[in-house]
Structures are given as structure tokens and as C-alpha cells.
Amino acid sequence: YEEQRKQYEERLNEEKRRREEDKREAEEKHRVSEEPYFVFKNSKVVSNSNSEQTILRMEFLNKGRGAAYCIIPDLECIAKRMDMSEFTISRYEAVQDPIAMVGEAFVMVMSYDKDEKNFFRMTPTIKFEDDSGRKYKQTFEIDISDRLGNGIIINYAQPELCEE
């Protein structure tokens, strides 16, 4: 009788383990089906930039499978000049529309000193949530290649699931 009880408990534990594994797998499939995914579309220097700051308007497109909510780009990001020395680029204004449905663009406006060179690599990070409130971040590497602010994407940043 004791042996049967032991086997029964082992079967129950194995069943419980399988159910938990199936549940995790289903949750991951659901998460991936809702995951927003930003791609860099373009950037340009805004012509009404004041005399001390250069204003850079950057556009990203949500090409994921779900909407992105509570979009918050970093307040600052580090940029590297061609000689590998660093300077800071700051967010110039608050996000005008913190929601990007699939196929919609999201605009981020940054600024940096007018004295900086026109050729540099920046690494902005964008944080956002999906439909279920899961938090993500995506860090891009973008080369600004001329005085007009035209950008070239260097990496294909994947959304990373953030810990709470």
C-alpha cells in the first residue's frame, strides 16, 4: 500500500510539473503574440533649432504584433564621436503620444550642443509596455551621418523583457 501511495504522489508531482511547464509555454506564446517591436525609420535635424542646441527628431515605427503603451525614451543617452570620446544627448521634449499601435510611428526629440560634430553614434533606449502590462526595453545603435541629422541604424535591436 505504501508503495502505491508513493507512486501516486510521484505521478501527481510529475503531472503538476507538466501543467506548470505547459502554462509557462502558453504564457510565452501569448507574450510573443502581443510583443511590440520598434524599428528605426529616420531622423533629421529640426530647422528651428536654437543657437545653443541642435534638435534631432527621430522616428520609430511599431512593426510588432501588438500596441506599445507608456512609451518612455531615456532622458539622456551617450553618443560617441569618431575619436571614441563621449558626450551626452538629452531628451528635448516629452513624448507627445505615448501609445503606438501596430504600424504607427512614435517620435522622440533629442538635443545636443551645437558645437558637437555631425558624425557620431548614439545608443537611445526606449521603454514601453504591451497590452498585458509587461515591460520591455529596446536599445538602438544609430549613426548620425551628416549635418542634416540623417541616421543609419547599426543594430537590429530586439525588445527585451524587463524584470518588474
What annotation goes with each model-predicted range?
Residues S51-R57, A105-F106, R121-M122:
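Short, solvent-exposed loop/turn segments enriched in Ser/Thr/Gly
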Residues N62, L75-A79, I126-S132, I144-D146:
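Beta-strand elements of well-folded, non-transmembrane domains
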Residues Y1-G66:
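Membrane-proximal alpha-helical anchors
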Residues I78-E116:
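Intrinsically disordered, low-complexity Pro/Gly/Ser/Thr-rich segments with frequent PxxP/GP/PP motifs
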Residues E34, F38-S43, S47, P73, ...:
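Generic structural motif
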Residues D131-E164:
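Acidic, serine/threonine- and proline-rich intrinsically disordered appendage/tail regions
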Residues R65-L75:
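Short, hydrophobic/aromatic beta-strand segments
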Residues N118-G133, K137:
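Serine/threonine-enriched low-complexity regions used as flexible
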